[in-house]
Amino acid sequence: MFRHAFRTFAFCLFATVFGTDVGFGQGLATPVSRLETGMLGAGRPWQTPYYINDSNVDGPTVLITGGIHGNEPAGARAAEQIRHWPIARGKLIVVPRVNRFGLDQNTRFIPNAVDEQKDLNRNFPSSEDPSRLPRGEIASALWDFVVEQDPQWVFDLHEGYEFNRSHQPKAGKEKSVGSSVIYAKNETLHELAQSMQLVVNRTVTNPNRKFVLLGRGPKLTTLANASRTVLRKNAMILETTYNFQRLPTRTRQHRTMMDVALRRLGMIEVDCVDVVVAPRTDDGDAQVVVGIYDDSGCSEGGANNIELALRDSHPTTVVRLGSRDMRPQVLDQLDVMVFGGGSGSKQAASIGKEGAEAVRSFVAAGGGYVGICGGAYLCSAYYDWSLNLVDTHVFTGSRDVEGHGPAPMWVRGETTHVEVQLTDEGRTVFADFPDRMKVKYHNGPIVSPRLFPGLTPYTPLAIYRSEQVLHPPQKGTMIDTPAIVSG
């Protein structure tokens, strides 16, 4: 368990996180379940984990698959989160990352597969051809697993590239199935699909992006269609839309729909949409749970880079979160929340006052905060939209520049590299880093003490030893100021 040693860090450039101790904090009654983990295709290069959560109480068996298409990550991430939900009845089986190599390479197809087998979701049996077998190792292994587990329900989580409701494809092109529920229409499935659509659409404000029902049934040779027609199972494909929406939004949409489905089936007894990781345990091998903000005001590429950097650190579970996730029910599951580069003011506007208060409460309860560039502006105590987590004043405002007119002082030019030096305190935190180093810089905050009521003085961990200057009034204002602080 963690949450006892975290502080707030403001980074003008880059970050690494360690640490903490407090419970799951959700008040969820977790039934006594039997948990089983194994590998689909064990020993093969493409092997991928599956998870079985058996409540030991009579109820339906449900299979959830994600990541069959590698460029559709929201389904894989949602499935990975859903596998941690507390099951009250029945058995929940989850294969989150079926096409693992495709997900790693962000490609729809199976990397290096022959052309006729590269689309994994066209490799399954068909009732129209009883002699047809699954094509390729992955489809064969997954199909054998489905047959062996014998679920009553199969939910395959996908993403389309455009919103079906508003997509207008060119002549001869197929309409995208993004933001839809695909099923073969019958009374049982239609009633459930309507309930899922109703609830998820409450979270969608743009009418052109709302979910639609496609009762025509899944395409032939897809996993869902084969499960339906060959094995006679209830099967659905849930589609979000990966263009124009950030990853946490789409992942939450999948969780929302599956929450409706599992509650209607009597498998969960409480709202689980906000459950994104496993419950806390007293296991000494517990991982640090890090939330990365990935929504308006934050660079999506920056969020990707933060996640990549964390893969090689202390055992870490990373969750990408959006503005709707800035609530106690989600944050209480984390050890650290990271806000990366972008615009601090836009991040503040996106999370809103309730989200800001949730972040403050999370930190006050012992959670960690890492602010990088835009996130460092956000956690300062300077602006009326600031979180007031660190006692930092920000060098900003406008100055008159000859031949230019008023110039904002926070703008220092294009991305460059500057030199920083660790302080004695910084060397204890960043023991694996050299004393002086070049780091990437792009208009991060130049800070000094604010003396904000209720905040303790910050501790500098690194100092700028060079500076970037765009206008004469900026000269000398960056050198020897903090590059990284903790508070």
List each model region and its residues.
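Bacterial N-terminal signal peptides that target proteins for export
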Residues: 1-10
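Short glycine- and acidic-rich boundary segments immediately preceding or forming the N-terminal edge
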Residues: 13-15, 19-49
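Active-site/substrate-binding loop(s) of hydrolase catalytic cores
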Residues: 40-45, 59-61, 73-202, 206
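Short beta-strand-to-loop junctions in surface cap/lid or active-site-entrance loops
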Residues: 49-58
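Active-site-adjacent mobile loop/cap segments within catalytic or ligand-binding domains
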Residues: 215-277
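Helical hinge/lid and interdomain linker segments adjacent to catalytic or ligand-binding clefts
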Residues: 295-384
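A glycine-rich, often tryptophan-bearing local segment used as a flexible ligand/cofactor-contacting loop or short
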Residues: 345-434
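Catalytic beta-strand/loop cores that center a nucleophilic Ser/Cys/Thr
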Residues: 413-487
